[in-house]
Amino acid sequence: MYEKSYEKEITVYQYECDVKNRMTAAALLKQVQQISTEHCDIFGLDAAYYQSTNTAFLLSKISLLFHREILVGEKLKLVTQPSLPVKAVYHRYTSAYDEQGKEAASVDSRWILVDTQTRRILRKIPENFHFPFLTEQVPEHPCKLVKSECMEHAGEQSDVYSKVDQNGHLNNTEYASIRVRYWCPFLKLLSIQYDPWCWLIIMSCVLEKQWICLWAPLKMATI
């Protein structure tokens, strides 16, 4: 069995929204994480399978784009599409469509498959690894890295039990909340009212009880 995509319908609830009844970035990422997990579970790619093959998928980069504000009570259709790896990177693109069939938001995530025993990146699909997603290419965001010319200390964040996943790592969706929490004062300072892009460049996993130091860019230069 092979499916290029998987879809489900969701309703945006109040607890997923901010003070202005807008769906938060973290809430949308949680929904994207859930539909991606469900898609993998259909083909047997669950926690037990990864453990038996000593493998794990780690998120290396993720980009979220809101085409417009998504409000409480809206019904969305999520469509997720994974692809074959390109240079050891596995892409998964997920779209959120409104009831008029227009794309309200999209998420481009990039993953790497690692050997949990040797801690090495597996640049090719292992022979004994069942990977059912055969699409060669999916849509993607222009995820260019941004070099900051000047940085200012924005704060520090400690991980806690309620925010870690089954691997003891900070849950990927929590990075969105952290970004908004420490970035909003700088957005107000720069008189930016609405930021449709939420770029989360995840370079390493944060383990439980570890601290991360956050720096906010004052001037950006694309590289």
Residue ranges of model-derived segments:
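Hot-dog-fold acyl-thioester-processing enzymes
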Residues: M1-L59, S106-D108, D115-Q193
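Phosphate-/nucleic-acid-contacting segments
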Residues: P196
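HotDog/MaoC-like acyl-thioester-processing domains
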Residues: Y2-K8, S63-V146, I201, C205-I212, ...
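Short, well-ordered coil↔helix boundary/capping segments
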Residues: H169-T173, W199, C205-L207
